[in-house]
């Protein structure tokens, strides 16, 4: 229950090399592919409008580029970060913000390359937690929702209104922040953890 508070700088010492740097490196590769597709496509200018074959070639290149962009956004939406002793959710809050920052950067850079601007899709479901204390688990859920709403508003997007908060569940309907023992299952066997791309905390 926050018995040991970890400040943002220390959290970033884990989140940066485990989440931010690898995902930005992946995006750099995808961005290079997108840039190459767009640069090789026939260009339209005020003096030269594209027609027929050139227009079709440019349309195909832009569709391929957009497909790469959307595939990376899907990667971010499906990315999962787990804190198996999440306390009141400080690591989850920071991880959510960083994943949303990456998505925002990806969408902005894709738009600079000429692709349509994307709306934020990464949400609280990307962070998973396990916490023994019911009170701390509920605080973690609230922290994650506060993080989602604060990020959306701070970056000029409207937060969800109906509902403002929805239950934090994965695709199978399991709580993303689970109130249970992370080490032992109720029958005394080893506890199973949810599938995650990275473990933080």
Q: Where are the language model's segments positioned?
A:
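SAM-dependent methyltransferase catalytic region
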Residues: 3-201
